[in-house]
């Protein structure tokens, strides 16, 4: 999408911004410094190298302005924007997400595949381990379904593990979800989630990136994109994370940006719970049910309550008859244990069941 109000910026200025965006060692703050100093990207590109040096900008940035690679990349981006459902949001235009605009290093340009309007909707970020346990994945999916049903857009990084579970679960209940990439949109990573990303776009959600379309995976870009995940959101929920997890970076950034930080506790013997426990010690809200999140964010919009599972759920009926262990429920219901555990997690979130001393009971 060219800017919604096309009178705000000329085609020449748009191309100039895309060229500026591709220059090496030119991050968000330097990008805006150039626009402020010269008034527009077109004038910044034509300014003498000495003027760039006077602003403290590196020589490598100025020298690359007229390179073939920079020009070709900008032309390719213009062609990409001409296709359906492919958009560009700019930091100085009214369509840019208001919450994201508040952070110090908001990306000046944001490429969007899908529906850009959902970036303005109330969002809750969900992050966690790429190597999540099965219970961790089930917990992420259960919370995502409930939060999406309550009206939140679920925002995450489209990584393996918790991210993917959160995105997929939101789609399953007809919710919307945003994936923030650490690569360009044309260099999708991880490839295993390409189909998930396509489903998100097809179902009215979005995939976004601040990087040039052809930017390949680089280790340093993934922590950098985390500030966008937190910056778009009202709060960040960490589901399962070790003490060295990148999810803790997102949580730290969220706190610095004035966002809420939530963490789900786990077993003291589980290494992937130690990061969440550290966050709780540092002041994150300990979350056991969705109500712990909704209580703090209810004022942002008229949220509907999550749709509860019906009281006649087969597992609830079995538990009304007598308490059962998870394994006994699997045998009695004829369902796989993994499916039973996932259902029990959702039922517990809805307040219909409770686990005491290893046995599940139905709540009256």
Predicted regions and their residues:
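Short, small/acidic-rich helices and loops at N termini and domain boundaries
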Residues: 1-95, 326, 350-358, 362-364
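Glycine-biased, small-residue-rich flexible motifs in mid-sequence functional cores and linkers
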Residues: 2-13, 90-364
């Amino acid at each position: 999408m060219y800017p919604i109000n096309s009178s705000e910026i000329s085609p020449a200025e748009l191309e100039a911004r895309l060229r500026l965006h591709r220059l090496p060692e030119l991050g968000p703050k330097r990008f805006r410094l150039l626009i402020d100093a010269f008034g527009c990207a077109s004038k910044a590109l034509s300014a003498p190298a000495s003027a760039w040096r006077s602003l403290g900008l590196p020589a490598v940035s100025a020298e690359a302005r007229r390179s073939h690679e920079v020009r070709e990349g900008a032309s390719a981006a213009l062609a990409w924007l001409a296709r359906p459902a492919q958009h560009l949001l700019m930091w100085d235009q009214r369509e840019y997400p208001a919450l994201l605009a508040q952070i110090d290093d908001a990306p000046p340009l944001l490429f969007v595949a899908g529906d850009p309007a959902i970036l303005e909707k109330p969002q809750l970020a969900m992050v966690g381990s790429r190597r999540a346990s099965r219970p961790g994945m089930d917990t992420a999916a259960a919370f995502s379904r409930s939060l999406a049903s309550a009206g939140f857009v679920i925002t995450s990084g489209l990584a393996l593990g918790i991210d993917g579970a959160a995105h997929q679960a939101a789609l399953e209940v007809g919710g919307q979800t945003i994936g923030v990439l650490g690569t360009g949109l044309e260099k999708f990573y991880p490839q295993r989630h390409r189909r998930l990303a396509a489903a998100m776009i097809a179902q009215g959600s979005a995939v976004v990136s601040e990087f040039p379309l052809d930017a390949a995976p680089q280790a340093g870009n993934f922590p950098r994109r985390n500030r966008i995940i937190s910056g778009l959101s009202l709060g960040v929920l960490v589901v399962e994370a070790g003490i060295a997890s990148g999810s803790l970076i997102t949580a730290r950034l969220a706190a610095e940006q004035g966002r809420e930080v939530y963490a789900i506790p786990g077993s003291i013997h589980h290494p992937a719970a130690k990061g969440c426990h550290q966050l709780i010690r540092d002041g994150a809200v300990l979350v056991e049910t969705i109500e712990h999140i909704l209580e703090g964010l209810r004022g942002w919009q008229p949220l509907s309550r999550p749709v509860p599972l019906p009281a006649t759920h087969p597992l609830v009926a079995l538990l009304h008859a007598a308490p059962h262990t998870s394994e006994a429920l699997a045998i009695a219901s004829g369902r796989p244990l993994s499916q039973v555990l996932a259902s029990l997690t959702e039922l517990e979130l809805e307040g219909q069941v409770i686990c005491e001393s290893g046995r599940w009971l139905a709540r009256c």
